[in-house]
Structures are given as C-alpha cells and as structure tokens.
Design a protein with these regions (language model features):
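Membrane-anchoring hydrophobic helices of lipid-metabolizing enzymes
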Residues: 2-77, 84, 191-193, 219-231
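Catalytic core of membrane glycerolipid acyltransferases/transacylases, capturing the structured
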Residues: 60-118
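Generic beta-sheet signal
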Residues: 114, 140, 168-171
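C-terminal functional extensions of proteins
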Residues: 201-204, 208-229
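A cross-family acyltransferase "interaction/gating" segment
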Residues: 150-209
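Acidic, metal-coordinating catalytic cores used for nucleic-acid/nucleotide bond scission
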Residues: 95, 117-120, 144-151
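Catalytic-site beta-strand/loop segments enriched in glycine and acidic/polar residues
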Residues: 126-158, 162
C-alpha cells in the first residue's frame, strides 16, 4: 500500500525537529550560562570609573554603549559593579538573537528585540519607555553585523528622543582569544585581568540637518573609541 505524500512511520516531522532543536538550544543556553559564571569567577577586575557612578545611589539613568565584541561577560560586569541598577538590553531579532535574549534574561535583564544599526520606531518607543521608567538601556551600537567599531544611527535617535545621556563603556583584557567573526569577538582567557572603563556621560544634541546628525554620530563614536586599547 502506498503511503502517498504523508509522513512515513518513524520519520521526524519538521515541527518535531524544531521542538528538538528548541529544547537543545535551551539546554545549551543553560549550560553556557553556568559555564560563564564559573569562568568569570577566575577573572580579576579593575575599575576605571570616570563617571563616578559605581557604588552610588541611582540618581540618573543611562543609555549604556559597548562595542559588540566586548559583550560576552558584560552582564556579569553589570551584576558585579551595578547591582542596584536595572534595565533592558537591545537584542537582534534574528534567530541567533533568540539564544542571546534567553541568556540575557537569565541575568535578570529585560530584552527588547531589534537592530541597533537599523532601530525601528517600535524598538525606539519601547526603549524610551524603559528609560522613562527610571531604568537603564544597554546597546551595542555596531551590532549585530557591523562594521566593527562603526556606530549605527539608532543610538543617536534614541538619545535624542529620550533625552537620556549615553554612557560609553569598554572592557579590556590582559589575555584573550579572538574569534574569526566580523568583529573578531573577544573571549577573555581564564585568570585574565579585566579592566572596566566607564566614560563621562554624553548628551546628544538635537539636530536639524544630516550634517549635524553625522557630527553627533561621529562625536559619540570617537568617545567610545577613546576607551579602546585592543582593536
């Protein structure tokens, strides 16, 4: 008897495959989360707080800006040095972003989906609401696809609409591995020293022409690059 176009007995359907992949992905995220916690405990930290906000009461909220290739242990850095601060992270709406969003939520942060390079009106509105509620926002302004160290316009739009200052931040490592990704993503080696650099907050000015907007974009990009030692 012909089975026609129906599924053969014992075969896995596409829907079942997606469920299996989803369970595997969640298991990998949970395992990676625990591994990252153990890994981070071997690291030594040094703080360079030029903004004077570490350990201080929360009096102002910020748009935290960090280059994408420094992202790996950043949630742990926030937990360690800013336990009193809460907020949301902008994560790519891609499938790869699904796993990162799950991991970020495990660190206790809310997630807004969207691209920092092409931030849509919905994402800007959601992030503005987070800032208006007194919480912080974290963005990697060259993510999710680069070019590396090139600041996308989304963070400028957000800072102008919300009025919140941008806080450039950076992580430098004494010893690390570099991946072959578009931004040469950085993995600190176990027992490395991590320097946490925090710049003075920067307010983005309102702009009326493309030239003025580009000047603000370059000024913020330069402020972030001033913290970078290892490219």
């Amino acid at each position: 008897m012909s089975l026609g176009t129906g599924e053969r007995r014992g075969e896995t359907t596409p829907k079942e495959k997606l469920k299996i992949e989803g369970r595997l992905a969640r298991w990998l995220v949970a395992f990676g989360f625990r591994l990252l916690q153990l890994w981070a405990r071997t690291l030594r930290y040094e703080i360079d707080d030029r903004a004077g906000i570490v350990g201080k009461p929360v009096t102002e909220n910020y748009v935290g800006a960090l280059w994408h290739n420094r992202l790996l242990i950043f949630p742990l850095v926030l937990q360690r040095f800013f336990p009193q601060r809460h907020g949301a992270a902008l994560i790519s709406a891609s499938r790869d972003g699904d796993l990162l969003a799950d991991a970020v939520q495990r660190f206790g942060y809310d997630v807004i989906r969207g691209s920092s390079s092409r931030m849509g009106a919905t994402a800007i509105l959601q992030l503005t609401q987070v800032l208006a509620s007194g919480r912080d926002v974290v963005i990697t302004p060259d993510g999710p696809r680069g070019p590396a160290y090139e600041l996308g316009p989304g963070i400028i739009f957000l800072a102008q609409k919300s009025g919140a200052p941008v806080l450039p931040m950076n992580l430098e490592y004494s010893r690390c591995w570099r991946l072959g990704s578009w931004d040469r993503f950085i993995l600190p080696r176990p027992f490395a020293k991590v320097r946490v650099l925090i710049s003075q907050p920067r307010y983005v000015k309102p702009t009326g022409t493309p030239e003025e907007f580009e000047a603000e974009r370059l000024a913020l990009q330069d402020a972030m690059m001033a913290l970078v030692e290892m490219r």
